[in-house]
Amino acid sequence: MIDRNSQFPEISLCEVLNRLRAGATVVTPNRRLALTLTRKFDQIYTRASVSAWHTADVLPFSAFLERIHSNALYSDQAHVVPQLLSIWQERLLWQSIIVSSDADHPLLQHSQAAELAQQAWELLHCWDLMQKFTHFPLSKDANHFLSWANSYCDITKNKRQIDAARLCDWITENYQCVFLEKSTSFIGYGFDFFTPQQARLLRKLHDDGRQVSVAYPESSDQIASAPCLKKKGHVEFATTDDEIYHAAVWSRTRLEENPQALIGIVAPNLTSVRNAIQRIFKSVMYPDACWISPNGNDIVPFNISLGLPLSSYPLIDAALLCLSLLQKEIPFNRASQFIHSPFWVGGESERIPRALLDAELRQLSEPAITLDQLVQLIKKIRGEATCPLLLQCFNELVALRDTKLPQSSGYAIFARVFTEALQRLGFPGERKLNSEEYQTVQKWQSILIEFASSGQNAASVSFYQALSHLKQIAQKTLFQPESLDVPIQILGVLEANHVIFDHLWVMGVSDEQWPLRPNPNPFIPVELQSQTQLPFVSPSQAFAYSKKLTQRWLNSADEVILSYPKNDDDGNALQASPLIHSVAKIPIHLATWQSQDELIAQSCKLESDSDHQAFALSEKTLEKPLKGGTAVIKDYAACPIRALIKHRLN
C-alpha cells in the first residue's frame, strides 16, 4: 500500500480548481468524488454569471485508463493495442474455464466462483502479487484458481486481449507508444492510498516531465485545526425504522431552515436498508403521496446513491418476462403481469378489456401455462374480439419462436432475436416514457450490446443458456437513473469518503455494523494478503480504516450526528460501536412534525363501538349435536378468526 503523502506533493483544493482552469486532469477513486469536484468547479462559473466554459477534466481512475486505451485504438499505434475485455466478457471467460475444469472438481455455483476468481485476479495484479502467489504455499482452492488463471492468461494472450486488471500495467509498459494525453498536470484527488500498479503509472508520468500532485477536499492542516464549535454527538433509537424516520424528519427540518444546505445521510448497511430508507424518506418528504402525479416526474429532494438491480425495474422485468415466454411455461401470475403490462402495443388502449380478460383466464388456467396454452385459452373465451392487439402480441411471439429462434447459436444472434421479439410487441409501449423509464430503456440497450459482445470467447449456446446469461447481467447490474442535483444525498460508507456536507447524519453505527468486517478473497492465501496489507483483509486493518473514516466524518460537516438502533429486526439487543464511545451522547430536538395520516385522524371525530359477540346459532343448527370439542379451543387459541370461520361459518 502506497501512503497518500509519501511520493507526490499535496496541494490545496483552491490550487486544484486553478489547475483545472488551466487544463489539468484530475483522477478520483470513484465516480461520486468526480461528480462532487466537477459541480464545485462549475459553481465558480455560475456564480460569476459566466455563460460558457470548458468542461473540467475530472474522471475516475478506471475511466482515465479506458480513455487512454480508447485513444490508442485510433492512433497510428493501433496495431499494438490489444482488445479490452468488458467485465462480462471477462466473467464469462472465467466461467467457461471453470466449467470446463469442473469434471474433476465439481462446483455448485460456477457464476459465483467466476466472480471470486475475477476479483482475485484483479487483486493480484493491482498489488503486484502474481509472482509471490505462484511461489506461495497454496491451499486446494488456491491451486484450482492458479490452474484457471493459467488457462485464462493463455487464452487472452493468444487472442490479443487484455482486461481491466492488467490495463494499467500495459499502459505503463507501452507508455511511449500509447500515452496520448495532452495535459501536463495530473492530480490524484481523494485517494487514501495508491496501489503499486497506480503508483507505477503516476511515477512514469512524473519521469516524463508531467506535474503529478495529490489533493483532498480538506488538507491535513485544515482537518487538524477544525473548530471545536461543530455540533457532534451520537443518538440511540429503538429500531432501525425509528432511526430512519428521525433522520428523515431531521433532514426535512434542516432543509426547511436552509434550502441551499447540503445534507448527507450515510449508512454502512445501505444495501439492506435501502428500501426502508426510500419508503420512509418519501413518506416524510411527501406526506400527501396520494397527490403525487402518477407519471413519476415529481422531483424528490433526496437521492440514494445505491442503485437497484436492473432486473427489478418494471420495464426490464417485462422484457425478460416476454423472452421467458418463448422458452417454457411460466406461472400464471407472471402471465397475468404480462397481460396487464403497459409496455406492449395496446397496453393503454386495451387496458380495461385486458383486465376483464385476465379475470376470465384465472377461472380456466392451470397454475403454470405455456405460450401456446395461453393463446388457446384466449381464443376459447373469444378474447380476440375484445383484445385483438394482445392476441396479436402472442401470435407474433409464436411466429418468431417457430421461424427465427435458433436452438443453438452465438450471443450476438440471440441478441438480435431478443431485440426483434420486443420490437414486434411494440416495446416499450404506447405511452410517453418518463425520465426514469427512458433512462432504463437506454440501459437495457447497453446491456444488450454487452450481452452480444460477451460471447467472443464462447462457443454456441442454447436459448436457455443465452437467456440465463442475459438475466444474470440484468440482476448483477446496479442501475440508478440520473436525477437533478438534490440537497439530500444518501450514500454508502466509501462513497461518502472525503465528501464535505453542511449537515451529516451517519446511521446504523452499532457494534454489529461498525467497524467494517474483514473480507479476504478465498482464492488468495490470507497470510499473503495480510503481508501485503491489502485493505479489509484482517480485523486490525478493517478497524484502523473504519476508525479513520469515523474521524473524517466528525470533521466533514458543521453538524454531525451518529446513530444506531438498540435492537435489530430480530429483536436482538445492539450496542453502540466502540468507535463512537468517545462521542458524547446528545438529545435530539426536532420540530413537531405530523404525517398526513395523523393530520387526517385529528381532523375527524372518531366513533367506537363494542362488537365482541358473535351471532347466535340458528335453531336448525341447534337441532343437531354440536361438534368440535377441544378442537374448538385449540383452533381458537391458534387463530380466533380462523376458528370462527371453521366452526361457526362452516
Tell where the protein language model's regions lie, with residue ranges.
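Polyanion-engaging groove/track-forming segments
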Residues: 1-650
